[in-house]
């Protein structure tokens, strides 16, 4: 409980920094889970650079982009009524999610040194499956998030749920 209160104080004092660091930490955790539980690499075969890349993506891309998106979305559709939460979820999942995945997957490819041609082929292969999988998880999560969670906690709530999603994304992005 003391850790949660410390997090709340830090979030109140430095919302943007804390949100970005939270996203980075949980993206890194998602990659660790992917490598250890999904891919079963073991500690000897764990790719630390990959984990650091995913954590960096969380801090440098996911945190700022998703955190910024939530602010824009709250400006476009203010309030937390059921109807507004539904509108936010539809805009998020119909507009933002497809664009986000379309940027995230190739960004991982670039950071992994893939050629433009290989990256494009991988995006064409993996994007439809990633987007469909997105729709199994995120509409319900986002509906609850937009209805029940204050704006400054949304990124943290999503990133906690996203530990599972990040594990999937890391696995999907690193499949050859």
Curated annotation (Swiss-Prot):
The chain crosses the membrane at residues 18-38, 57-77, 94-114, 131-151. GO terms for molecular function: channel activity. The keyword Transmembrane helix applies. Pfam families: Mpv17_PMP22. It is found in: Mitochondrion inner membrane. It is a multi-pass membrane protein. Keywords: Membrane, Mitochondrion, Mitochondrion inner membrane, Transmembrane, Transmembrane helix. InterPro entries: Mpv17_PMP22. Its main location: mitochondrion. GO terms for biological process: cellular response to reactive oxygen species; glomerular basement membrane development; homeostatic process; inner ear development; mitochondrial genome maintenance; reactive oxygen species metabolic process; regulation of mitochondrial DNA metabolic process; regulation of reactive oxygen species metabolic process. One of its GO terms (cellular component) is mitochondrial inner membrane. The record marks 92 as: Determines ion selectivity. The keyword Membrane applies. Belongs to the peroxisomal membrane protein PXMP2/4 family. Non-selective channel that modulates the membrane potential under normal conditions and oxidative stress, and is involved in mitochondrial homeostasis. Involved in mitochondrial deoxynucleoside triphosphates (dNTP) pool homeostasis and mitochondrial DNA (mtDNA) maintenance. May be involved in the regulation of reactive oxygen species metabolism and the control of oxidative phosphorylation. This is Mitochondrial inner membrane protein Mpv17. It comes from Rattus norvegicus.
């Amino acid at each position: 409980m003391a850790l949660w209160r410390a997090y709340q104080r830090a979030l109140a004092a430095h919302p943007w920094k804390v949100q970005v660091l939270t996203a980075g930490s949980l993206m890194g955790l998602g990659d660790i889970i992917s490598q250890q539980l999904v891919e079963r690499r073991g500690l000897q075969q764990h790719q630390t650079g990959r984990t650091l890349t995913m954590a960096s993506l969380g801090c440098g891309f996911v945190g700022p982009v998703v955190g910024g998106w939530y602010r824009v979305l709250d400006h476009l559709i203010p309030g937390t009524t059921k109807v507004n939460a539904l509108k936010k979820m539809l805009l998020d999942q119909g507009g933002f999610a497809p664009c986000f995945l379309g940027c995230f997957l190739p960004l991982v490819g670039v950071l992994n040194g893939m050629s433009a041609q290989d990256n494009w082929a991988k995006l064409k292969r993996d994007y439809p499956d990633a987007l469909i999988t997105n729709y199994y998880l995120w509409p319900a999560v986002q509906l609850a998030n937009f209805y029940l969670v204050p704006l400054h906690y949304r990124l943290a709530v999503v990133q906690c749920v996203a530990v599972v999603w990040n594990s999937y994304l890391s696995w999907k992005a690193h499949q050859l």
